[in-house]
Amino acid sequence: MAQANLSETLFKPSFKHRETSTLVRRTRHDQETQGLHSTLEGEKTSSWYRMINRLMWIWRGVNPWEIEDVLSRIAASQADRSNEQLLDTVIGYRGGNWIYEWAKQGADWQQRATESGDDAQTGQFWLNAANLYSIAAYPHIKGDELAEQAQTLANRAYEEAAKYLPYELKELTFPIAGGGTLTGFLHMPSQGKAPFPTVLMCGSLETLQSDYHRLFQDYFAPAGMAMLTIDVPSVGFSSRWKLTQDSSFLHQQVLRALPDVPWVDHCRVTAFGFRFGANIAVRLAYLESQRLRGVACLGPVVHHLLSDPNRQQQVPDMFMDVLASRLGMPFSTDASLKTELGRYSLKTQGLLGRRCPTPMLAGYWENDLLCPKEEASLIVNSSAQGKLMPVNFSPVYQNFDRALQQISRWLQDKVC
């Protein structure tokens, strides 16, 4: 896309779009969640609607100074906000608006990519743009038109990056029962020869496929494993489907289609679940044990948060809004949402607690509101070959890296 056209389409002020935090109408309880900090979600403070997820953004490759620069522009804006107490609620697509500022930053890197003459540098610049466009769309609330445009830009930039970086990216299309097709990205390492042992990625509810590039680049590819990503229901390429109690519906059909994908060794497939993605992955461990060599989870959300109203009351509004959006319940009462969430518990569904033949690893942090130790233990104790992996909180970045290294080795061991 030419820079002139990019500026015309991206940065023309518009005031017709609803502000992100107003898209889900629920009873707010921010006052009870101040100061919450989670390794995987980031920090919740009284000044922001969104969780500020510096660790994960830096891990994906965004420069820390760049993060602070964008956040400061948002914070300094004098424009009208839907909630004057929350800095990231500037109304309209203009300076100070969350989507506007992050997309503008992404466009800067896109421009650099088009001007660069070095392939490695060009690929990295496109990847930087994809990361920033994804943050612009975060937390990917259904019906957020500006966020959906940013998602499209993120996916385009991600595909452009792959043309220049030392791995192969294939866009795969899978037919879905009931109609429609689903697009997934197969990442293949530059070393080795297809068909590859493959990790099916089950991401968290507020991420895109492109957000897991670092996981492939630094962990799976060096181990000789491919990575297949699929958007969770109601996000990105999966936006036409809402999340149901059959949370693994889309991933299960993709898993069953892998024998027809020549680059994937369908006899050597594992799954990896982040947060709610673990709900999908563990469900697959039960329903498709003959197709999976192992399932690893990090900070899994499979029972306690879904079934405990008191725990839900402590969760930041943004996280509960994301859940309501994914379930297709943006206008529901808190009571009806919490009742529905209880049905997503894999223990309530009669799965967890039963013996599962699939090897499962579950990593957790102490005092994690979304995933207490009991959550991870429930998964591990249900597996015929379970492994519990505690992760120390500090130093945060090093321990996160160490956890991913352990998970990668464990998955590699299952497909060797």
UniProtKB/Swiss-Prot annotation:
It is an enzyme of class 3 (hydrolase). GO terms for molecular function: carboxylesterase activity. Residues 19-39 are annotated as: Disordered. It comes from the Bacteria. It holds the Pfam family FrsA-like. Keywords: Hydrolase, Serine esterase. InterPro entries: AB_hydrolase_fold, FrsA, FrsA-like, FrsA_esterase. It catalyses: a carboxylic ester + H2O = an alcohol + a carboxylate + H(+). Its EC number is 3.1.1.1. Signal peptide: none annotated. SUPFAM superfamilies: alpha/beta-Hydrolases. PANTHER family: DIENELACTONE HYDROLASE DOMAIN-CONTAINING PROTEIN-RELATED, ESTERASE FRSA. Belongs to the FrsA family. Catalyzes the hydrolysis of esters. HAMAP family: FrsA. This is Esterase FrsA. It comes from Pectobacterium atrosepticum (strain SCRI 1043 / ATCC BAA-672) (Erwinia carotovora subsp. atroseptica). The gene is frsA.
